[in-house]
C-alpha cells in the first residue's frame, strides 16, 4: 500500500520538526484535560514530598501526544527525560545500562512497552518496585545474583496496545491514563499555534478545515498543516486561505471526514460483506496490509466514530458505513 498522508507513524524527517512544535508548558498543551488535571495534582504532591512520581502508563492510538506530555512532566519535575523504545531493549544488559545511568527522580520513557520480552520484564519488576537491579552472573548451580541499588526514578510506559501488556507489568504502574481523540475545536487551536511557530498566516476557516480532516489526531493535523503550507508556497501565497486548503487536501486524497483511500477500501470490504463478520486476517490479505497496522492505525478512529463493530467472529460494517458508501443493506434472508 502506498504511503498515507494520514499514516500515524512518525516519519524520520518529522522528528526535529515535531520537537520544534511540541508544547513546553501545561498552558500550551491543548486537550486531554482530565489527564492534565490529575497529573498536575500528582506533580505538585511529588514536589512537595521531594519524591519521584509514581510510574505511569499512557495508552491509546498513536499520535495523541504521549511523548509530548512526558516532556512536560519532566520539565515540571525539573528532571531529565530519557527516551527509548521497547524494540531497542533486546537484552537484559541493554536495560541495565539504561537504568544504571539514571539519576534520582529522572524519568524513563519506554515507547511500545507492550513489545518488551518476558525476560526484560523480569529485570524491570524489581527496578520498578524496589529500585533495585538483580543481575544474574553465571548459569546453573554456580549462578549468583548481584543486587544493585538504583536511584528512585519514574517509568513512563506508552503503548497503542494496552491489552498486550502482561498483568504483572500493568499492575506495577501507579497511574494509568487512556489518551482520547481530540475534538475539531482542540485541533484547530493546535493548528493555529503551530502555524504561528512556523511564521505562517492561516485563515480561521482553513484551520477548521484541516482540523475536521485530521482524524482527531494532532500528529495528522500538524502533518496536513505542513503539506498545505507547501501548496500555498508553490502558489506564491503567504496566506493559507480556504481555497488553497481545500485544493491541497483534495490533492492529498483526504476527504471531509479525514478518510483516505485505505479507509474507504477497508469500509467497502466490510459493507460488501452484507452483515457477515469479516476476519482480521481476511481484511489484511485483501488490503495487502499487516494486521497490526489495521488494528492500530486504521480501525481506532473508525471504531470510535461508529463505522464498524468488532465481534468475536470478525468486523461488521454499521448502517453509518452503508449510508456513507451508498451500499444498501440487504435483508439477511436474501443472503441464503
UniProtKB/Swiss-Prot annotation:
Keyword Transmembrane assigned: no
Gene3D superfamilies listed in its UniProt record: 1.10.8.60, P-loop containing nucleotide triphosphate hydrolases (3.40.50.300), Winged helix-like DNA-binding domain superfamily/Winged helix DNA-binding domain (1.10.10.10)
Chemical reaction(s) catalysed: ATP + H2O = ADP + phosphate + H(+)
Keyword annotations from UniProtKB, A to Z: ATP-binding, Cytoplasm, DNA damage, DNA recombination, DNA repair, DNA-binding, Hydrolase, Nucleotide-binding
Enzyme Commission number(s): 3.6.4.-
TM regions (residue ranges): none
Gene Ontology terms, MF aspect: ATP binding; ATP hydrolysis activity; four-way junction DNA binding; four-way junction helicase activity
HAMAP family: DNA_HJ_migration_RuvB
Subunit structure: Homohexamer. Forms an RuvA(8)-RuvB(12)-Holliday junction (HJ) complex. HJ DNA is sandwiched between 2 RuvA tetramers; dsDNA enters through RuvA and exits via RuvB. An RuvB hexamer assembles on each DNA strand where it exits the tetramer. Each RuvB hexamer is contacted by two RuvA subunits (via domain III) on 2 adjacent RuvB subunits; this complex drives branch migration. In the full resolvosome a probable DNA-RuvA(4)-RuvB(12)-RuvC(2) complex forms which resolves the HJ.
Domain remarks in the Swiss-Prot or TrEMBL record: Has 3 domains, the large (RuvB-L) and small ATPase (RuvB-S) domains and the C-terminal head (RuvB-H) domain. The head domain binds DNA, while the ATPase domains jointly bind ATP, ADP or are empty depending on the state of the subunit in the translocation cycle. During a single DNA translocation step the structure of each domain remains the same, but their relative positions change.
NCBIfam families: PRK00080.1, ruvB
Entry protein name: Holliday junction branch migration complex subunit RuvB
Amino acid at each position: 500500500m502506498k504511503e498515507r498522508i494520514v499514516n500515524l507513524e512518525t516519519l524520520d524527517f518529522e522528528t526535529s520538526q515535531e520537537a520544534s512544535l511540541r508544547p513546553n508548558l501545561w498552558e500550551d498543551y491543548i486537550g486531554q484535560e482530565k489527564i492534565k488535571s490529575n497529573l498536575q495534582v500528582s506533580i505538585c504532591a511529588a514536589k512537595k514530598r521531594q519524591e519521584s512520581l509514581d510510574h505511569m502508563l499512557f495508552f491509546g492510538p498513536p499520535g495523541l501526544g504521549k511523548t509530548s506530555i512526558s516532556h512536560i512532566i519532566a520539565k515540571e519535575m525539573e528532571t531529565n527525560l530519557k527516551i527509548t523504545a521497547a524494540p531497542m531493549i533486546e537484552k537484559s544488559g541493554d536495560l541495565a545500562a539504561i537504568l544504571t545511568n539514571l539519576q534520582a527522580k529522572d524519568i524513563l520513557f519506554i515507547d511500545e512497552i507492550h513489545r518488551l520480552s518476558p525476560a526484560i520484564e523480569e529485570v524491570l519488576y524489581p527496578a520498578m518496585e524496589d529500585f533495585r537491579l538483580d543481575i544474574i552472573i553465571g548459569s546453573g548451580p554456580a549462578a549468583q545474583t548481584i543486587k544493585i541499588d538504583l536511584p528512585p526514578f519514574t517509568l513512563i510506559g506508552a503503548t497503542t496496545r494496552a491489552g498486550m501488556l502482561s498483568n504483572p507489568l500493568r499492575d506495577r504502574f501507579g497511574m494509568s491514563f487512556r489518551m482520547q481523540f481530540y475534538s475539531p475545536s482542540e485541533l484547530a487551536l493546535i493548528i493555529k499555534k503551530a502555524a504561528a511557530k512556523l511564521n505562517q498566516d492561516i485563515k480561521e476557516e482553513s484551520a477548521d478545515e484541516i482540523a475536521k480532516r485530521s482524524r482527531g489526531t494532532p500528529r495528522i493535523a500538524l502533518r496536513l498543516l505542513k503539506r498545505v503550507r507547501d501548496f500555498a508556497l508553490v502558489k506564491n501565497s503567504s496566506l493559507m486561505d480556504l481555497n488553497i486548503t481545500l485544493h491541497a487536501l483534495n490533492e492529498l486524497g483526504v476527504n471531509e471526514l479525514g478518510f483516505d483511500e485505505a479507509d474507504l477500501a477497508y469500509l467497502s470490504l466490510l459493507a460488501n460483506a452484507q452483515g457477515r463478520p469479516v476476519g482480521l486476517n481476511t481484511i489484511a490479505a485483501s488490503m495487502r496490509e499487516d494486521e497490526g497496522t489495521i488494528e492500530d492505525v486504521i480501525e481506532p478512529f473508525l471504531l470510535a466514530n461508529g463505522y464498524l463493530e468488532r465481534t468475536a467472529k470478525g468486523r461488521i460494517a454499521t448502517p453509518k458505513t452503508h449510508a456513507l458508501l451508498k451500499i444498501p443493506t440487504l435483508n439477511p434472508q436474501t443472503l441464503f
